[in-house]
Amino acid sequence: MIALSVCWQIVRYLCRIRQMXGLNAIEHSNYLRNYMGHLRQKLEQDPARPRHFITETGIGYRFML
């Protein structure tokens, strides 16, 4: 599970994939994207326009309170 505890913290995509999937990171490259989509569905008021789980293109995700 990904723990996001600091506002403005960028969760680097490849770092998190490697932590979750180890050496099989390439095989699971869509896992984090799907996981973030599920988090948005559950926690955002409007998942199509997220305010808390922001995608940083080419970098990863930003969690904002």
From Swiss-Prot:
InterPro entries hit by this protein: OmpR/PhoB-type_DNA-bd (IPR001867), Sig_transdc_resp-reg_C-effctor (IPR016032), WH-like_DNA-bd_sf (IPR036388)
Superkingdom as given in the UniProt entry: Bacteria
Stored Pfam families: Trans_reg_C
Keywords: DNA-binding, Transcription, Transcription regulation
Xref: SUPFAM superfamilies: C-terminal effector domain of the bipartite response regulators
Protein name, UniProt field: Putative uncharacterized protein YbfI
Gene from which the chain derives: ybfI
One example of a Gene Ontology biological process annotation: regulation of DNA-templated transcription
Ranges of the DNA-binding region feature: 1-65
Origin species: Escherichia coli (strain K12)
GO molecular function (one): DNA binding
